[in-house]
UniProtKB/Swiss-Prot annotation:
It catalyses: GTP + H2O = GDP + phosphate + H(+). PANTHER family: ELONGATION FACTOR TU, MITOCHONDRIAL, ELONGATION FACTOR TU-RELATED. Residues 10-214 form the tr-type G domain. Its EC number is 3.6.5.3. GTP binds at residues 19-26, 81-85, 136-139. One of its GO terms (cellular component) is cytosol. This is Elongation factor Tu. InterPro entries: EF-Tu_GTP-bd (IPR041709), EF-Tu_GTPase (IPR050055), EFTu-like_2 (IPR004161), EFTU_2 (IPR033720), G_TR_CS (IPR031157), P-loop_NTPase (IPR027417), Small_GTP-bd (IPR005225), T_Tr_GTP-bd_dom (IPR000795). Residues 174-176 are annotated as: G5. GTP hydrolase that promotes the GTP-dependent binding of aminoacyl-tRNA to the A-site of ribosomes during protein biosynthesis. Residues 136-139 are annotated as: G4.
Length: 409
């Protein structure tokens, strides 16, 4: 059977449901697909189908994630939902499922709970830029004042983590009632059923409030060097996958990391032994570089648009440390611990100087399974930017994953 061609007629965005356990994230995901399926803009997915999320690996870590896709009138969405809390933590830190925005699900009957807070904090630290709130289980709250109180509490909580709590759209509804309405024969048309309308209203807010992300190809050029070789009579070629942006023959680029930054001109772009005029984000290419010796460039450096990225050694990061059962360490570690930090294509040794818990207090040690903020100092400068992901390794095995939250020097 021929594979269906992916028609890219609408702008694309990646979103996901976040929030406390049992507040209705998966039911909402099922309700969105079921309601939109009525308009032919999604494939209806049942709760059980989403809940049985397949395992996947990201940066050496196993995570359970369900991926669904659907469309609204304006956009195409890829939506992720995780069955367990630990899966959210791992997913957001590894960036396995990048989110341009999130739907925070809060039970109107319970209000914000510990994981509500933790997911908002995580969203802030890993750089999920926009949040829309769905107050679920509205059918279980008889008192309109109570609903207003919960809304106020959610807005204050979001503001306390530097999200614009006063401006964030909050839609109240019931995912279960909407699902049951469609199963009971509701059309999915606006105005036919009040519970279905609330799901449609939520998607209108998501469409309007979460901005369309800049396409990778429109961002500044960056390619991590994977391999380097010499072509006799032509010069030095660096190969790798273009992470973002584009590169054309004749353009000036910088070689960043491990040594002093230097400029060079791209004299050729090749892919699969064919020459191209330009390489785009996602392409695996070889770039021929003018005036560069094979010894001047090595794996772990990046090629980038001049001035777009700089080398650093010291940064703050949010890290998830693998449990023993996940293949991680069996024992805790302390400040001064020196593992390898695997960034893009290479391992760099770094020392961990201090740990900070969520409440801002200093932690004395880190136990496998913890999520912690830590300050890292690498022995060699490499191209680092806020929001960049890395793995922490020890003797070649992954013991943790992290994301850069702040560059220090």
């Amino acid at each position: 059977m021929a594979r269906a061609k992916f028609e890219r007629t609408k702008p694309h965005a990646n979103i996901g449901t976040i929030g406390h356990v049992d507040h209705g994230k998966t039911t909402l995901t099922a309700a969105i697909t079921t309601v939109l399926a009525k308009a032919g803009m999604a494939k209806a997915r049942a709760y059980a189908d989403i809940d049985a999320a397949p395992e996947e690996k990201a940066r050496g870590i196993t995570i359970n994630t369900a991926h669904v896709e659907y469309e609204t009138g304006n956009r195409h969405y890829a939506h992720v939902d995780c069955p367990g809390h630990a899966d959210y933590v791992k997913n957001m830190i590894t960036g396995a499922a990048q989110m341009d925005g999130a739907i925070l699900v809060v039970s109107a009957a319970d209000g914000p709970m510990p994981q509500t807070r933790e997911h908002i904090l995580l969203a802030k630290q890993v750089g999920v830029p926009n949040i829309v709130v769905f107050l679920n289980k509205e059918d279980m709250v008889d008192d309109a004042e109570l609903l207003e109180l919960v809304e106020l509490e959610v807005r204050e909580l979001l503001s306390s983590y530097d999200f614009p709590g006063d401006d964030i759209p909050i839609v109240a509804g019931s995912a279960l009632q909407a699902l049951e309405a469609i199963q009971g024969g509701a059309s999915g048309q606006k105005g036919d059923n009040p519970w279905v309308d609330k799901i449609l209203k939520l998607m209108e807010e998501v469409d309007a409030y979460i901005p369309t992300p800049e396409r990778e190809v429109d961002r500044p050029f960056l390619m991590a060097v994977e391999d380097v070789f010499t072509i006799t009579g032509r010069g030095t070629v660096a190969t790798g996958r273009i992470e973002r942006g584009s590169v054309k023959v004749g353009e000036t680029i910088e070689i960043v990391g491990l040594r002093d930054t230097r400029s060079t001109t791209v004299t050729g772009v090749e892919m699969f032994q064919k020459t191209l005029d330009e390489g785009l984000a996602g392409d695996n290419v070889g770039l021929l570089l003018r005036g560069i010796q094979k010894t001047d460039i090595e794996r772990g450096m990046v090629l980038a648009k001049p001035g777009s990225i700089t080398p650093h050694t010291k940064f703050e990061s949010e890290v998830y440390v693998l449990k023993k059962e996940e293949g991680g360490r069996h024992t805790p570690f302390f400040p001064g611990y020196r593992p390898q930090f695997y960034v893009r294509t290479t391992d760099v040794t770094g020392a961990i100087s201090d740990f900070t818990a969520d409440d801002g207090s200093a932690a004395e040690m880190v136990i496998p399974g913890d999520r912690i903020k830590m300050t890292v100092e690498l022995i060699n400068p490499i191209a680092i930017e806020q929001g960049m992901r890395f793995a922490i390794r020890e003797g070649g095995r992954t013991i943790g994953a992290g994301v850069v939250s702040k560059i220090l020097q």
